[in-house]
Amino acid sequence: FRSTHNNFLFDIHIYNTDILSTIFDIPLTVYTHSTLKGYFNDALQRLRIEGYFPRLQYKNNYIESGMILCENPADHIRARVRLTNLKKKGAVNLSLDAQAKDDNVSTTLDWGNNAAATYSGKLAAVAKFLRTSGEKSLLKAMVDVNPTDVILNDTLWKIHPSQVVVDSGRVDVNNFYFSHQDRYVRINGRLSE
């Protein structure tokens, strides 16, 4: 058995995506020069993929300033996505950050608009994945929702700490609480098949 060394660099420049629509029926149009570059180093077990997409359309979504990054700089893997989704009445900036290490994934989603009424906020959670015991081991996820703020129509709302557990086809929501003064949404319960 001979060991291989899969070390490579790539630098892809994208000018025209007509072939994706024609052959693969992917509804993607790139309007300006976009790039996808990175590397994979087998010996160091490192990877990095970064993409820049200044202006594109996927189905009916118009996107500007798109950026993706995926890398494993140390003992974790990190992914970032940033974009501006253009709407008829303004734009929405979106940012997704995720880090994974030791069966844990930390995720933060930020959004904000630039219209007359503000809609913005953050959703942050940490998911822990583990296997259930027994004859047929299943994947279980425990998602801890972190406290954050959300602005809906210029009004500050709070997301309070809660937990969601996904186990064997069941989803348990434990004390999800979203509030503004005396108005709130509280969810406790189980979704099942």
For each feature predicted by the language model, list its residue ranges:
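Interface amphipathic segments
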Residues: 1-193
